[in-house]
C-alpha cells in the first residue's frame, strides 16, 4: 500500500487569503493512500521542510504532494528535501494552488473547490510515478532552424559563429522571407534589402551553414539533444549544381499567367521563375501546375535555351534524414485571410489591398517600380485610407482576440512614406 503525504502551504496570505487551506487538508485526508496531510504557513521554509522530514519518518511516507506555488519556484526545493530523507525526488508532485488558483480567483468557496481538485489530481498523478535516476546522453552538436527569413538567418548566423553546424530549412525557393518583400524598415525607414541581402549572402557562404531551400520538414522524432528529422527537398526540375542563374529560361518561358507569390499577385510570373533578383540560391524552380511541358508534354523551351543544360523534368523529391541537438522554429507569419471581413471590400474592389500588397507597390523592385498606383486604373491615388487592427482585437470570432503588436508600427511607417 502506498503512503502519500500531502502538505498544503499558506504562502502567507497569497494562498490562505483566498483558499480555505484547512478545508483542503480535510478533503485530501479522505482519499485512499493519503497517510498524512497538514497545512503550514511557509512550507518552503526550513521549518516547513523539517515538518515534511518528520512526517516522512513518523508515517513512513513514500510519496509526497505539496500544494503550493508554481513548480518553477520550489519543485527543486521539495525534491531535494525528499531526497534527503530517502524518497526518490521524482516521487514528489506539486499542485499549483497559487498561480493557478488563489491568484486568479476571488471567491473563497470557488478557490477552495478548485484547490481541492488540483490536490486530488496531483495525488492521482503521484500514485503512478516511478523512481527515476538522472542519466546522461550525448548531445548532437548540430542545430536545425526551420524558416529562412530574417529571424532564421540571424539565428543560424549566431549559432554558426559560435562554432556549431546549423541547417536552415525554408519552404520557399529562396531564403529571405517576408523582409525581402518590404521596402523599408520601421522606425528608421532604412532600406530593407540593404540590411537583409548581406545576411543572406553571409548565411549562404558560411562554412557551418547548410541551406535546404524549397524544402519542408516531413517528420521529427527523438528528444531534446537528439532529434531525428526527415526533410523533404522538393524537386525544382532544375539541377542546382549546374545552374548559373543567368535567367534566360525565365525570360523565354511562354507561360506567364501565374500570379507572383512574391509580388502578392500584383503581377504575373512564368512557370519557371526566380522569386526576386537577390534570391539565394539564384536557381529557378518550375511550377509544374503552370508548366506547359508538365501539363501537355509539349513546349520544353526552357530546356532548349538553357546554356548549362540544367533543366531536368524527371527530377523527383528527395528525403533527407539528419540528426540535430536543437531545433529553432522561425516560421514567420501570414496575413489574416480577409475573406472573413467583407465589410472592407477586399476582393470586391481591386483598390482595397493588404499591407503586404502595399509594400510591393511602394517597393522600387516591385511590380510598379515603387510608384503607388490604384491597381484598378494604374493611376496615382489622391487619398489613401489605412484601416488598422483588421483581424486583431476581434471579439466576433473571425480574427484574433489579441493585439498583433505590429500593425500600428507598420501603419505609421506606411503613412510616413506615402
Residue ranges and their predicted role:
Residues 21-35, 43, 51-54, 80-97, ...:
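N-terminal glycine-rich dinucleotide-binding loop that anchors FAD/FMN and/or NAD(P) in oxidoreductases
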Residues 43-45, 213-225, 288-290, 317-318:
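A conserved short coil-to-beta-strand element within the FAD-binding core of flavoproteins
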Amino acid at each position: 500500500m502506498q503512503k502519500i503525504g500531502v502538505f498544503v502551504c499558506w504562502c502567507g496570505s497569497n494562498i490562505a487569503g483566498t483558499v480555505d487551506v484547512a478545508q483542503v487538508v480535510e478533503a485530501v485526508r479522505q482519499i485512499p493512500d493519503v497517510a498524512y496531510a497538514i497545512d503550514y504557513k511557509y512550507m518552503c521554509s526550513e521549518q516547513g521542510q523539517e515538518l515534511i522530514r518528520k512526517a516522512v519518518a513518523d508515517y513512513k511516507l513514500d510519496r509526497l504532494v505539496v500544494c503550493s506555488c508554481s513548480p518553477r519556484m520550489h519543485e527543486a526545493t521539495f525534491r531535494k528535501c525528499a531526497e534527503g530523507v530517502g524518497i526518490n525526488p521524482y516521487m514528489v508532485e506539486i499542485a499549483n494552488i497559487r498561480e493557478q488558483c488563489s491568484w486568479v480567483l476571488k471567491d473563497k468557496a470557488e478557490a477552495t473547490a478548485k484547490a481541492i481538485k488540483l490536490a486530488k489530481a496531483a495525488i492521482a498523478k503521484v500514485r503512478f510515478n516511478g523512481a527515476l535516476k538522472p542519466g546522461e546522453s550525448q548531445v548532437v552538436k548540430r542545430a536545425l532552424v526551420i524558416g529562412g527569413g530574417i529571424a532564421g538567418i540571424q539565428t543560424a548566423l549566431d549559432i554558426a559563429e559560435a562554432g556549431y553546424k546549423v541547417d536552415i530549412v525554408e519552404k520557399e525557393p529562396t531564403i529571405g522571407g517576408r523582409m525581402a518583400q518590404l521596402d523599408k524598415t520601421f522606425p528608421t525607414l532604412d532600406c530593407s534589402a540593404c540590411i537583409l541581402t548581406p545576411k543572406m549572402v553571409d548565411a549562404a557562404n558560411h562554412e557551418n551553414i547548410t541551406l535546404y531551400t524549397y524544402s519542408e520538414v516531413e517528420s521529427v522524432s527523438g528528444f531534446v539533444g537528439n532529434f531525428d528529422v526527415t526533410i523533404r527537398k522538393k524537386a525544382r526540375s532544375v539541377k542546382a549544381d549546374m545552374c548559373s542563374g543567368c535567367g534566360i529560361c525565365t525570360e523565354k518561358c511562354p507561360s506567364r499567367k501565374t500570379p507572383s507569390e512574391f509580388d502578392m499577385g500584383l503581377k504575373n510570373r512564368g512557370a519557371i521563375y526566380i522569386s526576386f533578383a537577390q534570391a539565394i540560391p539564384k536557381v529557378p524552380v518550375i511550377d509544374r501546375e503552370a508548366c506547359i511541358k508538365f501539363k501537355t508534354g509539349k513546349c520544353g523551351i526552357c530546356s532548349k535555351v538553357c546554356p548549362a543544360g540544367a533543366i531536368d523534368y524527371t527530377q523527383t523529391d528527395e528525403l533527407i534524414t539528419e540528426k540535430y541537438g536543437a531545433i529553432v522554429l522561425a516560421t514567420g507569419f501570414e496575413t489574416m485571410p480577409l475573406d472573413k471581413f467583407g465589410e472592407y471590400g477586399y476582393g470586391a474592389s481591386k483598390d482595397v489591398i493588404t499591407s503586404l500588397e502595399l509594400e510591393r507597390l511602394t517597393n522600387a523592385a516591385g511590380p510598379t517600380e515603387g510608384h503607388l498606383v490604384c491597381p484598378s486604373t494604374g493611376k496615382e491615388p489622391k487619398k489613401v485610407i489605412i484601416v488598422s487592427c483588421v483581424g486583431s482585437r476581434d471579439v466576433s470570432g473571425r480574427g484574433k482576440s489579441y493585439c498583433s503588436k505590429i500593425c500600428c508600427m507598420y501603419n505609421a511607417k506606411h503613412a510616413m512614406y506615402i
